[in-house]
Amino acid sequence: LAIQENINVMSEKIRLKNLGINIKSERLRKNLSQERLAELTNISRNSVSLIETGKINPTILKVIDIARVLDVDVNILIKEV
């Protein structure tokens, strides 16, 4: 059981990292700073940084907000997640 829990934790970390990579990639493609994305999504710049590095798990509503601001389909952000 402990091994399966470790696998699940590792899988979640990889998925969060991939989500963060996708968000950062789209943000940079739009030439937005973390600060500007934070302003437009009403979250802190630190939270944007933590999301982009996979250190926190944003709510689905926050991911939808980010997708809207970046003008991309949410599926682009959750690709390979």
Cite the ranges covered by each PLM segment.
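Short, basic-rich loop-to-helix N-cap that marks the start of a DNA-contacting helix
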Residues: 55-65
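Recognition helix of helix-turn-helix/homeodomain-like DNA-binding domains
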Residues: 42-56
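Short C-terminal boundary/hinge segments that cap the last helix of small helical domains
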Residues: 71-81
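A short, Lys/Arg-rich alpha-helix, primarily the initiator
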Residues: 3-29
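Conserved hydrophobic/aromatic packing and binding residues within compact polymer-binding modules
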Residues: 23, 37-38, 48-51, 77
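Short basic helix-loop element that most often maps to the first helix and adjoining turn
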Residues: 21-40, 65
